[in-house]
Amino acid sequence: MAGRIRTLLAIGDIRGEVEPLKRVFEKLPETGADAVAVIGDLGVAWSKADIYRAIFRTLGEAGRPTFWVPGPIDAPLDDYLREAHNMEIAFPSLHGVHGTAAQADGQLLFAGMGGEIVDDPDAKRAEETLLRYPGWEVEYRLKIIREFKDRRLVFLFTTPPAHKGLHGPGSDVLAELIKTYNPRLVLVRGDGVAEERIGKSLVVSPGRLDQREYALVDLQELTVEAAEPAARTAV
């Protein structure tokens, strides 16, 4: 789908539930969403390839530019990456941005890091039983952002940044990263649809799709609308 991205459909914690995702996309035309962003967890613990395949196929068939990062339990990483690679070939609108970045609409840059981010520089990274990374690795892998200084930046993280307004534990490294790069929008994992500001950056939790929550974000006005999937039709 070509054209400028203004309205972003933000989804968190699919947790392997493909049917609620399909119901969200049934309402896609009326939402006016130009693109989709997904914060893991995508599957459940030790999800098989067919779960990831079904999720990515549903995202691809929605026909919108889509960007995502995996959650802490989307491990082993090899299984997730294999299916992401295959489905990004089948659906060019799909863009995983775990530890990397992807351009969109000539103006936006989506970048992020999934898994649990740990501030301790001596923390061991993990990708087999869960996804966990030391904060310095996030800083290193996302330095690619410096090559796109003229782009409006959107961050995707499954670990929230440290901030008193977010009412929970968070990463000081990610908070500093946000202050350094000044993204327009930061999407983070969390319970319930919520928003906060770190400097000029809007930080949004889209809630959990497995709890029938998601959000619409206006990237121009920086406003957030909580929404829920269409109800299942009785049979």
Go through each PLM region and give its residues.
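Core catalytic region of metal-dependent phosphoesterases/phosphodiesterases
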Residues: I11, E17-D105, P206
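Conserved beta-sheet core of the metallophosphoesterase superfamily
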Residues: G60, P65-V69, E88-P92, A111, ...
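Conserved catalytic scaffold of divalent metal-dependent phosphoesterases
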Residues: D74-V173
